[in-house]
Amino acid sequence: APKKKQVVAFLCDVDDRMAAPRRKAFPQAGFYHDWREMFDKESKNFDAVSVAIPDHNHAIVGLSAMRLRKHLYLQKPLTHDIYEARILTQAAEKYKVVTQMGDQGASCDGMRIMREWFEAGLIVDITEVYKGPTRPGWPQGIPWPKQHAPVQKELNWDLWLGTAEKTDYIDNLVPFNWRGWWRFGTGALGDMACHIIGPAFKLLNLGYPTEITGSATT
């Protein structure tokens, strides 16, 4: 049977600067700033939701989509913390929708080639895997700056905060450096671990960890 045509029916973004190129690429799509309004008004007019927003709002948007019986593609990291991940896992089982976490690192040609080598017996007897990151490329592990900055007129700061505690804006937080603040992001580990560590788990079918150790400097 022929595949059904995929249509981008609606776009949603709290930042008009970031939304502009997407709106230009999909001029036929409806546009909203508030995902809640879009879900309330348009839920009968779309089948699936793709979520690519700051980590702290992943769970609430993903859970709300599944409660509407919408299939869900949720960018990594799946959620801000483990509790939220468990809630989404339970919801996916309850509502019987198709779900996938976006992880380009596990979908690249390198992953496919490694799988071919492994299945051909070219890589055997693996007992240890070492992984190293190239991040962070942003400030992290420092106090929240006391020097606040004006919010750009194109950004709806209240909607961007979402589930996070209300706070003043700081310079250069959006669109990328929010990853370095726990109230919004998950640091270099949350941003890159799925790309760097994930392929080993997928290739070797490792399952859940049985023990984790860590250290940090101050």
Model-derived segments and spans:
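N-terminal glycine-/serine-/threonine-rich beta1-alpha1-beta2 phosphate-ribose binding loop
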Residues: 1-74, 80-98
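Residues embedded in well-ordered beta-strands within globular domains across many folds
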Residues: 10-12, 50, 127-130, 161, ...
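Glycine-rich beta-alpha junction loops
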Residues: 15, 132-138, 164, 216-218
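Short, solvent-exposed loop/turn elements at domain surfaces
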Residues: 19-21, 138-140, 168-170
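A structural signal for well-ordered alpha-helical segments within the folded catalytic domains
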Residues: 59, 63, 86, 108-112, ...
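A contiguous active-site-proximal alpha/beta segment in oxidoreductase catalytic domains
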Residues: 71-73, 79-159
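Rossmann-like dinucleotide-binding domain that binds NAD(P)(H)
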Residues: 157-218
